[in-house]
Amino acid sequence: LSLEVLAVLIFVVVVGGVIAVVIRAVRGRGKQEEEGGLDLIPYLILAIAVAAAGFALAALARASLTPDRLIGRPTGELAGALASLVVAAPITYLLWRRQARRRKTFPATPGWPVYLAIIELVFLIAFLTAVSQLADFLAGDGEQADWTDLLIYGAIVVFHWWAERREAPRGDIGDLPRLVGSGVALVALTIGLIGTLEWLFSFAYEALWGLGDIPDPAIPIALAVAGAAIWAWRWLPSWEAEPNVLRNFYLGFVTAFSLIMAIGAGVSMIATLLTFVLGEAGPAVDHFDAFPLALSFSIVGWALWYHHGHRLGPGRTGGRRGYEYAMAATGLGTLVGSTTALVAAVFTPTLAGTNSGSTLLTIACAVIASGWVWLTFWRKAQAAPRAEEARALSRRIYLIGMAIILGLTAAGSLIAALVVVFRALLGEIEADTASLRIPVTLTLTAGFATWHLFDQIRADGSGAKTIESKPFAVTVICSHPGTLATLFPDEATVRVLYRGDDAGMIDEEMASAIVAAVDRRSSLVWVDESGFRLAAARES
């Protein structure tokens, strides 16, 4: 047997075994009122089957619609595609019909949005890859235009968009498919915009100075157009549900990443300009040849930051907290690393030559920028009431996570420094004490940052203990409380009365606002489609 046939047989055995286990488990657990975690397994198998069938169909289309038709194609490639399609197509059909019936009984199953997100991730990437390959071919650089990939991958994506609109995912992860599609499209849009702007700026740079390399704009323009269309379709339409944990995480991550991209490009341009002004650079034409790319990164980064930052919402929302603590973590980590690099650059004799000034200026700019980022966002976090801020999950992740990372870094660098010291004390002639600069500096900077973080953890804990622990009761009338009960302190007694409709759902942002508004007082909370209302409860 060939390797392709053997691979298909293994695939059939594995899939058949998994299906048998799933069917046996489903039959054995009896009828349940709610869908359990096992529902994820059929959807994962369905996703694998759809992916296998889709890529096999694309391979067959490429083979049949090219000028040489099937002639000259490797036999194993065609046999593997045919075998995959024969096996995957029936599995796809049967599982699709089965899960469609189960969705009518269990409409809030978590497997449906997970399946849609997997398909969107896989086939959107495949579709955008086909777009770039076709653009490269049309520009005269590619060898072959597999335009059939566009049709097949695009048809699969559009079909699942239609299925999603027909049966909208529900539950806490119902937004997952749209967020995945928005993220993939945003990456393509970002790459396309940066490449297109770099081409425009490089063209202007070459026209002014007569030198420089002009990149090919075909792929960036194609990615920008395709990414913008998909992103506008998946992200810009209004969202039915209020912001939840997933959307807050997405917004916080994208906002933080875009600002990091903009600041990093800005630091690079400032360092390049200062190096030239201070006479530490070569010819201007060669020195500024990286400016078009850095300027493109900066423009796109600021644009993305502006767009997503305005959607974080006012006040201390979950998304805004995540964004600010992510920026504080990035600033603190970069500050520790760049400070260590600056000390090493200052005291390294080999940098006394030609480019020592440019290296020092670049690292110094990084130190200043990272310090400014950390101070700015840490002060924003400190401006919020500590009693409310100390309970935020993003703050705990920042303090504990960074304390562990920087603490381990300080411990590792201290061990490295002690190894050098002990080697010298033991009389090893080749022991170079000059190598102590980096581990000692890293031990001091990371150790000081770790001490600061643990001090804040201790202050948060002591601040929580000093708060009056008077018991109080809260009665909430809503459709679903979400994580509200977990945000109240231990002395709170929370009672939930369900409305019986979907008009009073509580998301993470509203839950934090309710806890802040209650302020450790016995209260009645009414939640409807317009928000929540609060009334003081009579204490017995």
For the regions a protein language model found, what residue spans apply to each?
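Hydrophobic/aromatic interaction determinants used to assemble and anchor large protein complexes
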Residues: 1-413, 418-478, 486-502, 513-531, ...
